[in-house]
Amino acid sequence: QKIKVAGIYTQPIQQKWDARLHLALDAAAKRGEIEYVFSEKVSNTDYVRVLREYCASGIQLVVGEAFGISKEARKVADDYPEIAFLMGDPFKPHGNNFSVFDNYIHEPCYLMGIIAGNMTKANKIGMVGGYPIGEVNRLFHAFMNGALSVNDGIKFKVTFIGSWYDPPKAKEAAMAQVEAGVDVMYAERAGVVDACREKGIIAFGNVNDMNKEEDGTGVVVTSALWHMESAIDHAIERTKNGTFSAEEYHNWTMMAKGGATLAPYYEFEGKIPDSVKGQVADLSKKIMSGKFVVEINDNEPKSTF
């Protein structure tokens, strides 16, 4: 039996964060499990109106993001106790029907850091991100810690561009970091890979497979991938059988439940030492089994040179 699901996105569905939600919901729709409708480019000022309209239309599950409107979104959930809400949100679950998620892909970020720490020759690594908020900060810290675990002499340059999508600004920030001496970059935002290609240095990708999807061939060594399928499928199943409750879905976006992985090395397969690939493979198994825990640090990371 199909359930009706609405996706409400603040960005275009091509934007990588919302794209991961849309892909997972679209896959469920193609399997015939849900009837899926969505709205994109919904501003925070208009979000509650759109949310209420969907709730009044017979939707059974809403998937979206409440980062700028946490309190208001919870009020809507209170007004529609029969509807399930799965929202990107930095706070705790609410009531009986408001579950929260975020992208906890810090584990593959740590693994990328190990590779980066072995590949830098200058011992200077650059990172360009959107905003210094938890979901970005934790990824940067994990990447830094992974690099430092194999090379404690590395210094970092950190820049936030104040936008989720401004490729020219991200490229400019990356160019400035390369001028400052970095020879490896973490491309948290689109635009960084372009700078790395022009400057002849390598990069590591974020959320989506930037080697294949952002013209990163020969530049992007690997990417920390975020998969929302496990979380979305769990929410759909719970909604269908009437057991949906207010939960934290963080674990569903981590490696053990298939919510995060490391992308293939592609043409870098032969450029990464076998010993490093072996170390990453061994540590991946330990993370999956719970024998190794990657620290979560949501504090703003700072440049160290």
Where would I find each of the regions flagged by the language model?
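A residue-level marker of the well-folded mature domains of exported/periplasmic proteins
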Residues: 1-305
